[in-house]
Amino acid sequence: MLEFYGQKFESRLLLGTAQYPSPAILADAVRASQSDIVTVSLRRESGEARAGQDFWALIRELGVAVLPNTAGCHTPREAVTTAKMAREIFGTNWIKLEVIGDTDTLQPDPFGLVEAARALCDDGFEVFPYMNDDLVVAERLIEAGCKVLMPWGAPIGSGRGLNNPYALKTMRAHFPDIPLVVDAGIGVPSHAAAAMELGYDAVLINTAVAKAGDPVAMARGFALAVEAGRLAFEADAIEARDMAAPSTPLLGKAFL
């Protein structure tokens, strides 16, 4: 069972809530994904505006946990301020921390990220940092108080999948007891399955579902892929090899 900061969840698929064609399709996609956790952006959803109130009512109706994020923040100060506003509006200490360092790739700023994570952890937040796949940055985030890490698979919205499986595999081996979530860049269900086969605890999907021709069907596809990938990891899959190995025994074979 998936566990974040002492809370347990059945599904290992986290779903973003931005860019869907309509609120109804969003709701159907969340149900199809069987996700227990959805991410929301304070910059997109105001708890005071009517649209924000309608969105919040929809999320409550779905009965899922909410993980607010600091999307669009480029400085530690901006991210910390946004996180505090999110806590007031959504009533949770959880925060998906994003501090963007490059506008073209949306790559996280590792220095600003660690600074903001330290400030938020000291203030009682339970931080989910969106990060690159650097082990040293991961160490600094853990030292700052983070108990979950969210390395990217590829740039946000790119759909490229896992750009550096070696780095992700190394991070999994280096932090066997820290919940790890692949966040960003996943484009199709097979990418999610590959992440789960590496031993990752969960994946976070948004654009790949929201922008699909049929978001509801894609959400279901991701749910199945995440389950399949996790089962493969737990089943201890065979190692790849360069040469063939016969799978059919010779015992009882007729000699001609």
Curated annotation (Swiss-Prot):
Reactions catalysed: [ThiS sulfur-carrier protein]-C-terminal-Gly-aminoethanethioate + 2-iminoacetate + 1-deoxy-D-xylulose 5-phosphate = [ThiS sulfur-carrier protein]-C-terminal Gly-Gly + 2-[(2R,5Z)-2-carboxy-4-methylthiazol-5(2H)-ylidene]ethyl phosphate + 2 H2O + H(+)
Active site: 96
Major localization listed first in the record, in broad terms: cytoplasm
Subcellular location per the Swiss-Prot or TrEMBL entry: Cytoplasm
Keyword Transferase belongs to the record: yes
Recorded GO CC terms: cytoplasm
Alphabetized InterPro entries for the sequence: Aldolase_TIM, Thiazole_synthase_ThiG, ThiG
GO MF term (any one): thiazole synthase activity
Keywords, in A-Z order: Cytoplasm, Schiff base, Thiamine biosynthesis, Transferase
Subunit composition and interactions: Homotetramer. Forms heterodimers with either ThiH or ThiS.
General function of this protein: Catalyzes the rearrangement of 1-deoxy-D-xylulose 5-phosphate (DXP) to produce the thiazole phosphate moiety of thiamine. Sulfur is provided by the thiocarboxylate moiety of the carrier protein ThiS. In vitro, sulfur can be provided by H(2)S.
Name listed for the protein in its UniProt record: Thiazole synthase
Protein species of origin: Brucella anthropi (strain ATCC 49188 / DSM 6882 / CCUG 24695 / JCM 21032 / LMG 3331 / NBRC 15819 / NCTC 12168 / Alc 37)
